[in-house]
């Protein structure tokens, strides 16, 4: 029993010691490989066997996060994963000579790295490289994965704000090597969005890649670069709820000033209040928009609405002057009586009390002329005395004066009522016009969101 226990303990000890010894052998082989590779290696020179040979670099970009889009300064901040692959002619070995070791990971500062930078960089920091490891394979293939936070310039077009789409390009290329020395190409037709973290303000539609070969005035050789164009569309729900929808409701409320009775005294106050509310929203909009040549869509809508409210308030003041015109005003002109108080009043159903809609007021019969001596009423009885005749003539004169005064007062009152009715017709007419304008403008803007 004791002998069997002794053999079991010895077997377990060998089982634990054997992997450690093998691991140590693998570490020694990796150290030997590292010393052999970098004994006469320099990272200062382009790693090609022939100096006339072009070194090909493959560039792959993975979009991880949109950190910030500064519309006012037109700067886009992104978090990217950048992978670069190339072949180093001086870093090759036979895996069989090193125990089957076919890849090692070493600091990127030890090997030559392509000087690929972001051309449209927007900050003052000098271009630098992340100090991450590179994967080196036995055939000389080098793969360098590095995270990067980029700040690039992006021309923001706010003409369709808040339903706008932006195209922001990130151009990568070699800073010193021409196309005959270093050629950069994208891996795939677009950047990867597999690990992208969704942004609350922007929706990413894609990030296609495009290779260009340009020639600059300073040099005769071509310079290739790779441009990744980030396609963005703004999420407009917050702007619709906070800026657009209140303006739509206010614009629909403004024409209702024409429907208020003139005696309420609030017709002009409503228009001025609406104008002040639109001014406040206009200031809020101006704070979030960058200074640009093109006016955003919502800005045009605000200006059109404010113009409409201004005109409606001015027309309200003119109509109130017609409503409160004094008794000494002239009668309504014949053309206005026929056109506005006739056809337009019937079309808008503006009628006097007791008058059915669609029926115009019957023409007023002018009273028959009465002479001061022949007043209305039953004929006077026989009176032949001089005193009786004088009293009868005085009485008839007073009755005629009262009748003429009453007729003049009634004519002035009728003239005033005509002007008030004309004001109601114009109120109803402009209510329909301005409400239709506000509704059409609001629908045109809201259709952009669909």
Swiss-Prot record:
Quick one: signal sequence residues? 1-24
List, in alphabetical order, the Gene Ontology terms for molecular function in this entry.
Answer: acetylcholine-gated monoatomic cation-selective channel activity; calcium channel activity; excitatory extracellular ligand-gated monoatomic ion channel activity; serotonin-gated monoatomic cation channel activity; signaling receptor binding; transmitter-gated monoatomic ion channel activity involved in regulation of postsynaptic membrane potential
Explain the regulation of its activity.
Answer: Activated by a myriad of ligands such as acetylcholine. AChR activity is inhibited by the antagonists alpha-conotoxins RgIA and GeXXA, small disulfide-constrained peptides from cone snails.
Q: What results from changing residue 31 to H?
A: 11-fold increase in inhibition of the AChR composed of subunits CHRNA9 and CHRNA10 by the conotoxin GEXXA, and no change in activity on mAChR composed of subunits CHRNA9 and CHRNA10 by the competitive conotoxin Vc1A
Region ranges (Disordered):
355-380
Task: Note the SS bond partners.
Answer: 154-168, 218-219
Q: Which residues are glycosylated?
A: 40, 56
Q: Which family does it belong to?
A: Belongs to the ligand-gated ion channel (TC 1.A.9) family. Acetylcholine receptor (TC 1.A.9.1) subfamily. Alpha-10/CHRNA10 sub-subfamily.
Protein's recorded name: Neuronal acetylcholine receptor subunit alpha-10
